[in-house]
Amino acid sequence: GNIKAPEPDSGFVCSYLDVAYNGNIFMWDSAFMMMFARFGTRFFPFQRTLDNFYAKQHPDGFICREIKADGADCFERYDPTSTGPNILPWSEIVYYKQFGDIDRLHKIFPALCAYYKWLKLNHTWRNGTYWTSGWGTGMDNMPRVEPKYNPIYSHGHMIWLDVCLQ
């Protein structure tokens, strides 16, 4: 099945729903899967999938958007493709609105705040708008940079409206 137990010494804190793509856990996919998997919470505590991202959060607030099964980040923090848009709070608030789990919200709020601060410090332009890359946005099949830039890796010196709105 697609429910994976954490590997020993991975730093993951619980079993998780796997996208069955390459053995890695993805922030974007996991956040959106949780919005649907919440309906099966009597079968498995799917929302805890996101706890593995919080457990792998760096001291400065960075969370890698893709993490290997052994717990290693797939990208360095300053790589333009290293992290995804700030969609974890969206998934968490949807879960909270359905289940009213205030204890979970209290537990994860510091991690969400630290990640927000990291994004604000490292993925914004001088005017406060956000940037990312094709892979970083999670919508890597929607090239939007000019042809002279790499659609996967480059921010194209643009303001990424979808990231600003998230």
Q: What residue ranges belong to the model's regions?
A:
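Conserved helix-loop functional segments at active or binding sites
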Residues: 5, 59, 94
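The substrate-binding groove and active-site-proximal loops of carbohydrate-active enzymes
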Residues: 20, 27-28, 32, 71-78, ...
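Solvent-exposed, acidic/flexible segments
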Residues: 26, 43, 78-81, 85, ...
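Well-ordered alpha-helical scaffold segments within catalytic/enzyme domains
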Residues: 31-44, 87-104, 165-166
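The feature captures the catalytic groove of carbohydrate-active enzymes
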Residues: 14, 19, 65-87, 120-166
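Extended, well-ordered alpha-helical scaffold segments
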Residues: 42-55, 102-122
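Low-complexity, Ser/Thr/Pro/Gly-enriched N-terminal "stalk/linker" regions
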Residues: 1-25, 44-48, 52
